[in-house]
């Protein structure tokens, strides 16, 4: 099986031993507390679940700046996006060597982790802007990632953490949320060697379904891991529970048995396009996948990125040997009325735009909200029904 990124063995930061975890929770009650923002809490979940292996905590300012500018930590580890804990007001933890990190997304703000504080560093507006420009490729405050990142605070708290809770994900998504270690173990138990990861923050339609089939066939893969984002998205996106239902229904009806694992991870979408695509590759390698499907406008939003920027970054910015995972580059997939099947649009000749069934996300949402099923060439009827029920309930 493919090795984790940056180490021989996966090292999740979640404290699995019950007794040790209880002791740390008791200790945390008397430590100075820091209520995390949602972005830092998402980072803690990913660190705890082993997805951000081999990191041992939040980056310091030198590492964060170097990762943003050069895609490497100061010690030379390849990493695409700063993993940071930015704070607006650090006065409550000033001078503390050890602190409790509290969960902003769960009632009562329970302890998520215990942190050994290395430093609390002031971050200038110029440094925040430099990082935002490098990560997102823009400083437009309308960009959802930029809007979030630039408001997180100007104090960077760095240090190693021991994770004591994976937030609400295990309770809310018991059948879907999985740690990198759990997925890696499941892949090993199935005896899969060549494994394709499919990233999604949306319900899967015919084009996505066929893309997974194509990747499996062309790579002669043993299976696909559909890995859905369960954390925070932007306003108007479909909730994780509805997406989960749609994907499970599609897999149940339209994939051969025992060829697909449906799983999810707890992270907030960055909408960082190319940089986020590389981060996706890092943590799919950590969970044991040999390939990642990267499609058109992967992890993008609006018109901020070129359609294939998330593919070209792997050739242009990722040094040879930095990652073991391979990328399966995909063009836009759509149903061809000429060929009566889903195709990659760049692979068929004698087609004009009118020969494909193409619907924008806005158009699909409008149809579903009006109780109109998209054509079966675009969405499986069983999936469309789940979505129509959701939209009509929302508008009731």
Where are these regions (language model features)?
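Active-site cores that bind ATP or allylic diphosphates and position pyrophosphate for catalysis
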Residues: 1-396
């Amino acid at each position: 099986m493919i090795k984790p990124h940056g180490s021989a063995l996966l090292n999740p930061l979640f404290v699995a031993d019950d007794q040790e975890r209880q002791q740390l929770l008791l200790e945390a009650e008397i430590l100075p507390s820091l209520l995390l923002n949602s972005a830092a809490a998402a980072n803690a979940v990913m660190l705890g679940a082993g997805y951000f292996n081999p990191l041992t905590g939040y980056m310091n300012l030198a590492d964060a700046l170097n990762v943003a500018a050069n895609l490497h930590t100061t010690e030379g580890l390849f990493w695409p996006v700063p993993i940071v804990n930015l704070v607006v007001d650090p006065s409550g933890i000033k001078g503390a060597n050890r602190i409790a990190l509290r969960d902003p997304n769960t009632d009562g703000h329970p302890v998520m982790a215990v942190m050994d504080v290395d430093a609390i560093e002031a971050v200038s507006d110029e440094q925040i802007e430099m990082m935002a420009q490098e990560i997102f490729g823009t400083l437009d405050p309308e960009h959802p990632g930029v809007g979030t990142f630039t408001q997180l605070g100007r104090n960077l708290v760095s240090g190693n953490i021991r994770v004591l809770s994976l937030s609400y994900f295990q309770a809310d998504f018991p059948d879907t949320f999985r740690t990198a270690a759990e997925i890696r173990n499941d892949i090993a138990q199935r005896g899969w060697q060549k494994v394709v990861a499919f990233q999604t923050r949306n319900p899967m339609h015919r084009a996505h379904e066929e893309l997974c089939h194509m990747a499996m066939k062309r790579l002669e893969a043993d299976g696909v891991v559909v890995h859905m984002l369960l954390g925070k998205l932007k306003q108007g996106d479909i909730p994780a529970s509805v997406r989960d239902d749609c994907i499970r229904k599609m897999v149940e009806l339209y994939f051969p048995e025992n060829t697909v694992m449906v799983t999810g991870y707890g992270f907030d979408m960055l909408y960082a396009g190319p940089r986020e695509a590389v981060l996706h590759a890092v943590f799919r390698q950590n969970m044991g996948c040999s390939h990642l499907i990267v499609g058109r406008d992967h992890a993008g939003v609006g018109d901020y990125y070129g359609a294939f920027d998330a593919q070209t970054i792997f050739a242009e910015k990722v040094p040879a040997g930095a990652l073991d995972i391979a990328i399966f580059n995909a063009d836009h997939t759509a149903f061809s009325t000429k060929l009566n099947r889903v195709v990659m649009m760049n692979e068929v000749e004698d087609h004009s735009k009118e020969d494909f069934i193409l619907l924008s996300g806005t158009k699909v949402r409008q149809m579903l909200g009006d109780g109109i099923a998209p054509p079966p060439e675009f969405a499986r009827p069983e999936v469309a029904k789940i979505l129509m029920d959701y939209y009509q309930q929302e508008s009731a």
